[in-house]
Amino acid sequence: MSSKSLIQSGIVLLISIILLVNYLIFFSKNDDSVKINEAEIDNNVENKILELKYNAVDADGNSYIIESNAGKVSDKEKNILILEQVTGIIKIQNSEDIIILSDFANYNKTTLDTYFYDNVRLKYDGHSIDSDELFMNYVDKNINIRNNVRYKGLNNKLYADIVEIDLVTKFSKIYMLDNQKKVKVELKQNGSN
């Protein structure tokens, strides 16, 4: 083999090695960048459910309907839905419907327990209770209303820390957390105060 052919073969081999090294360095890094970007995109995706409605009926014929403008599954517990602009309707046999409104709620799809929060309002047969929080235990048929509770009835107003309601017996317990404080009651006289 002549020295001219040997030099040409060496140059071709050198160019091939340079191209291979460049390919491995630059193209493998681009693949990693694309994978990282895809992972960042996946982390930023939020799954929202729009116009959500659940309806549950127990063995006694009582029902609970919960509706929401939007919601998503909790990152921490897959049975919990975090809902926005929520309406809950409780229908107990031989009783008036109870309507609960709130800005947000955490709804357990398995137990039907619901924690309503932010601008909560409960309406029932001419009665209205506003608060910051309301917890409804559907199985036990009770409601616990707390934090900044304001009740308004036909002839009175009431301010307390906690109101507990048994939905079956209609028994209510109203009290303050601090025993030194009293529940504040305003009575209307002759239809006005």
Where are the regions that the model predicts?
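Mature-chain termini and adjacent capping regions
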Residues: 1-193
